[in-house]
Structures are given as structure tokens and as C-alpha cells.
Amino acid sequence: MTNFEPKKLKNVWTIEDSISTYNIDKWGDKYFSINSKGNISVTKDIKSENKIDLFKLVKELKSREINPPLIIRFNDILKDRINALHDSFFKAIKTYKYKNIYQGVFPVKCNQQKNVLEKIIDFGSQWNFGLEVGSKSELLIGLALLENHNSLLICNGYKDKKYIEIATLARKLGKNPIIVIEQRDEVKRIIQAVQELNATPLIGIRAKLSSKSSGRWGKSIGDNSKFGLSIPEIMLTIKELKEANLINEMKLLHFHIGSQISDIAVIKDALQEASQIYVELCKLGAPMQYIDVGGGLGIDFDGTKTSSNTSTNYSLQNYANDVIATIKDSCELNNIKHPTIISESGRAIISHCSVLIFNVLGTSHVSSKLQIFDKKNQQLIISNLLETYYELKKLKNKKINLSQIIELWNDAKKFKEDCLVAFRLGFLSLAERAYAEELAWACAKEISNNLNNDEINHPDLSEITETLASTYYANLSIFKSIPDSWAINQIFPIVPIHRHLEEPFCKGNFADLTCDSDGKLNNFIDDGKIKSLLNLHEPEKDKDYLIGIFMTGAYQEALGNLHNLFGSTNVVHIDINQDDSYKVKNIIKEDSKSEILQLLDYSSASLVESIRINTESAIDQKKLTIEEARKLMDQIEISLRKSSYLSE
């Protein structure tokens, strides 16, 4: 029996090696690092020295029976992101001597969770930070939560008569809803509501810009974009508002250039076009006060600071500077008063504060043991494969001849394929086919052990790493917890939260709990590059191997679905104290199986009763004893109260 072990890449593995491997110092934005124990640490804010140990936190949450998978939300990071956004705009206003203010709003669609929105409103209250809503349900949330009468409530999305009536009447409550006209037929509904309610709303217009956008959401802008008015439609709307004596309520211009804009040049072009539209609206007699630059402010998921879909080639300060400078220049050239600037920056505010933690249930990988069969009566094609394996073993510790290794690898692949053909035709037994596959894996492992990283990545050998990769089974549903990974191939930073004093010599990807081949994570940030495999540790027997998926705060909870009936995970809100301790502020318990079934109109009581009737029948037929039936029913009733995820 021959054993082949994972190749050790370095004699001594350091924390700096882990930081470089996972690019933590680049995408972590100073919020995440690795401490002296080799665990991920979380910082209170980018200016603070206060940190907590994430691995220790998860272990202590487990002692409270708050088990993975779970979302940990760091309130301090959320607050710091809001502060950073405002600080950037305040610096830009001061630098460019802008004669008005920045007043942001948070788009509710990014994260509708009550605890999250309450924190955002609280943290942003000193700046009159408001909300942006895109439906009647979100409008009701905004009206209920926004108590600051100086905050803005930007009303976007499709609007029927009821939506417009609610927003119009809410102004009499002292609220500041601004109804943004995004479709031409909304003008008529607004005029009708004013006539019927004897109340006037604040009005805005969303413009369709002709500037070109980029990235995954590039089609959010342009003549064929989903929302907004073309220039001719804007002219007609202004005419109708004047005729209805509503032009004095026209206060805001809004535009949107897509989400996660990676290239600052795209933002500049859109700002120039929108600023000129704003100037022209003022010239047409609208008493404009606000320009809403929408969303699009991106974050650096991969830490490369480039214009790729998963990064940005600009900083928060760059963004604020360009917004302020561009709007100022257009207004001053036309003697127009500087407007209050609004942005709908969701992803940039909410992403960093949430970390999804899951445990690894097990792994699968190519066999690490090779059975050497008796050569007597051995099929020729298997003998050829075995001979190739021995040729590769002879090269161990010798000077590398890459062309010879490539030739031997091509031979191994050919002989393995010959074995598969022979098996299909009935010339090889199942045991012989298994041996052939083990030989091919052994050839791959010998090559991997003899080559360095650059050599193994040769185009003719690169598939070897994939062949030897392990699958790590993750205790989570990708479709529920990180649906963007599946739906749009969004890259999130994924890192073990402990064991960073050890070399992660395994290469692997993750498979989730669902019975779906799409339920895999196989795109990772590796030393600043996107790769299909991640450096991971071999899980230790009877010990948790815990993985963190970072920057998951935007959209994931809202978009997650119940594929295979895996429900919401535990959610914990954490405050980091000045003494490097923490306080658990909120715990939102995971969905039980009973709660999930109830969502689909299944009554737990009815299900239990149906199964009970079946057990009684089985008892009558002597298929089940009374004791077995009792144990079965007990387990079912307990299970209904428990998590949909796997437990220890």
C-alpha cells in the first residue's frame, strides 16, 4: 500500500503569509485582520485599536446555543461606514467651498431588517440621514421608522394611486416624502391625488441619462433603462406640472447609473450630464433644491483597487470629491444656487458589517491510499498506467524536466481514458476501473508534489490542481444566505476564521446542503486574483472548522430563498467595547422547521397527526413496536422545533 500526503508549501507559515494569501489587508478595509493566536480579529472602527477575536466570539455564541450557520452583524462597523460617508462629503464640501450640504438616504431594499434600519437611522440622526423606498411596503416602513422631521424619504419605484396618496398625506404628518416621477403616467396620478386630497406632495423627477455605464448593472442607465424619463418626457412633465399649478413643488432631480460602479470615469460622465439637466430645470422655472445622485458607490470585494466587477478604482473620498466638484462647476457656470446633494449609497454602508459564519461538515477528495494489485493477469492498459506512475516516482527529488512530466501526464490521461472505454465495453471489472482511477490520481499527486506553484500552473498541467482538489461540505444554503454568489457569480471574501498559524496546504471549494448542483462556491479571492479553488486546512477530527464569508450585508437576506426548505439562520448584533470585550445587543433566532413549513401553508400539527396515523397502522401490522412508534413521534416533534440546518 502506497500513501501520498498533501504537499507542504513552506517550512514556516506566518500570519503575514495568511494575510497575503487571503488578501485580508486589501479588502478588509482595516476592519478585519489576524491576531497573534491566528484567528480573525474584528476592529471597532478604522481609527480604533479595539478588537475582538471572531473565533472566540463564535465559540462563546455556541455555548449560548447560537450555532452556525449564523450572521454576525457588527454595529460599530455599520456606524463607522455611515461616519466615513459623511466625513468624505464634508471634506469635499470644505475643499471645494461648496455652498450647501450633503444629506444621504439609505435604500431600504439593500437590507429591510428592522434592527438594521433602526441602527442606520440612529447612527445617521445627527446628519438627518433618511431612507429611500421603492414600494408601498417599504414606504410604510419608512413612515413608521423615520421620526426625524428633517430627514428625507425618497419615494421611488412604480407608484399606483394608493402609493401616491399615502406619500402625499404623510407630508401633513411633518414627514418629508419626495415622490420621484419615474413613469409618465405617475404625473396624472399625482395631479389627481392633489385635487382629491387637498394636499400637495414634494415632487422629483428621475432622468434617463444617455451616459454609458459599465459593470454588471450597466444597463440600468441609457435610453432603454427600466426607470426614468427621457428628455422629451421631462419637458412634457414640466409643462403639465405648470398647468396644474404644481411646479412650485418640483424640488428634486434624481438619476441612477447602476449598482457597484467600478470605474470612476463612468460616475464623472453621468454627473456632468445630470448636473446640466439640473441647471436646465432651474432655468425652466422649477424651484429646485436637491440633486439625488442615486446609488452606484462601489466597494472593493477583492482588494485589487481596479475597475473589475468586484472592485473599484476609486476611494470613498474620490467619489465625494467628484460629486461635489462636478455639481458645483455646472451650477456656478450658470449662476444657479448649489443644491443639497443626496446619495442612495446602500452597499457601501451596509456590506462590511455582516459576516456569515458556517462550519464544515466534512470533506471529499481523491483517495490518499493506492492499493498495488498483483501484476498477474493484469490488463495491459492498467499495466501501462502503473508503469507511468512508477516513471513519475523515479523523478522524485531529481532535477525537474517539465517537458518529460507533461508527456507522462498526457500518457496517464490517455491510459485512464482507455480504461474507461474498456469498462464500458465490459473488458474491465469495477474493481479494475477503481484501481485505474486511483492510479491516475496517484500520478497527479506525484506531479503535484514535485513541482512548484508556477510549474503546476503550466497550461498543460493546470487541471491537476482541480483533479486533486477537495470538496468541503458547508453547513449552509447558498440560495438562502448568499444568493448573489449563485445568481450573478458575485465574489465575496471567504476565509477560515482560525488556524492562521498553520499552512493551508489543501486546495478546495465548497458544496452546500441543497440537492442542487448549483449549490457550490467555486470562485475565490486568492492573493488578489479570482481562482476556482481556495487554500484551506485539513479539518481536525471532532473539531469545528469555521469559515467566514465577509461583506455580505447588502441584499443577501432580502434575496435569499427557501430552496430545499432551508430557512433563515441565526443573526446576532454585536457591540465592541473599549476594553476589547463585546456585548450581544440582539439575537434573532433561526427559523425552525415548523416555522418554515407554516410559510408554505403546512400545519405542523396536521403533519404530526398524519404521521401518527401511519404509525398506528404500522403497529397494527406488526411492522413497528409501540416503543419504536413513540421514539419516532418524539423525534419528529423535537425536529419540528429545531433548525433546518445540520446539528452536531
Swiss-Prot record:
> Would the keyword Phosphoprotein be found if you checked this record's keyword annotation?
no
Q: What pathway annotation does it carry?
A: Amine and polyamine biosynthesis; agmatine biosynthesis; agmatine from L-arginine: step 1/1
Extract one GO molecular function annotation from the record: arginine decarboxylase activity
Q: Which reaction does it catalyse?
A: L-arginine + H(+) = agmatine + CO2
* HAMAP family reported for this sequence: SpeA (MF_01417)
Q: Which UniProt keywords apply?
A: Decarboxylase, Lyase, Magnesium, Metal-binding, Polyamine biosynthesis, Pyridoxal phosphate, Spermidine biosynthesis
What processes does the entry annotate via GO biological process terms? arginine catabolic process; spermidine biosynthetic process
- Residue positions binding substrate: 291-301
Sorted alphabetically, which Gene3D superfamilies does this protein's record hold? 1.20.58.930, Alanine racemase, Lyase, Ornithine Decarboxylase, Chain A, domain 1
**Record's family?**
Belongs to the Orn/Lys/Arg decarboxylase class-II family. SpeA subfamily.
Q: Which organism is it from?
A: Prochlorococcus marinus (strain MIT 9301)
Q: What is this protein called?
A: Biosynthetic arginine decarboxylase
Q: What class of enzyme is it?
A: lyase
Q: Which cofactor does it need?
A: Mg(2+); pyridoxal 5'-phosphate
Q: Which residues carry this modification: N6-(pyridoxal phosphate)lysine?
A: 109
Enzyme Commission numbers on file: 4.1.1.19
Q: What does this protein do?
A: Catalyzes the biosynthesis of agmatine from arginine.
Q: What InterPro entries does the annotation carry?
A: Ala_racemase/Decarboxylase_C, Arg_decarb_HB, Arg_decarbox_C, Arg_decrbxlase, De-COase2_CS, De-COase2_N, De-COase2_pyr-phos_BS, Orn/DAP/Arg_de-COase
